[in-house]
């Protein structure tokens, strides 16, 4: 809800547990128009919290005085509509508030930084040197079954509306090479690739495999990153920023 100057009322999801009674986004006054998914800092009681401008119309009554948004993280692009829809689904499924779940999935250090401090972190990331040029990898020849799987996956990627596919194969049957070829097709189409690993112990091995394959294609310092519980808070923020900004 905005006026002609762009100011108005925004809904903001904040980290408030379900049992607190604050089960949904709260209304705040904003001096500028803010897109859904924008990260902000807002007051709640005596605290100041990280919040996310949430999709949907505000509910404030005209005679109610609203507290203002304190700061806007305008150095970051808003979180996407699909991300917000996923959080809405998860909040409903797990019976938690959207702000509580958002706080759990965003990097912990993000909750502690001001927009100015975050901007300084981003400038530091931009100064990271690029990796040395790597030779193009030698790809193994595909077995007929692998080639058929790669063809079907890449056709869906090219079509623009991929559907879930189940790749079946026993251990050692060559599934990882199919994943690598599918990732290569997605990267060639200008997209990002998210790989879910079943257990943390497999992360270094799989990350090394992807780095070896794509080092020549992705020479950036943070082109391939991982997110898991063994990372330090600073590493987690750095890697999340790389993914969110599209450099990873």
Where do the protein language model's features map onto the residues?
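Accessory, non-ATPase domains that flank or precede helicase/AAA+ motor cores in DNA-metabolism machines
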Residues: 1-248
